[in-house]
């Protein structure tokens, strides 16, 4: 009887230990899942910030910030539809992108109010898919301007200058999300011409 009782206690102890080990394994798995979910949320927020910094830099004529959002070998192009060839571009690399969108802006000298006068980009409906250190993004945009870079504020009514969607590819480099490819698909645009 004494051995049976001891064996029962030992068996119960082993069972309890097995249960605790199993519980710890479940907690570790849950913690990993939680960390993965948190990383996904952080990635999404960081990618949205890239899109917002892009719009703000373009709106204010901050060429340095604008090109810093692209990888050194990034590609930028404009299309009427995703299946069609670009009607503007491709521009390859930061220097080519800067030359196209900020041809007369020296380094460290933002223009006042963007190159078309007061401008606002409205970017919305983000569809973001992250796969470790790469991501694809689709977002819609409307660009509103008060035309004339050298006209007094309020002298020209705001107009829609462009609208469409962004089809982006981003990569994480040195802990930062950057555009590796940006395709602007336009539904309406004016004044977009290649710079020589």
Stretches with model-predicted labels:
Residues 1-5:
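N-terminal secretory signal peptides that target proteins for export/translocation
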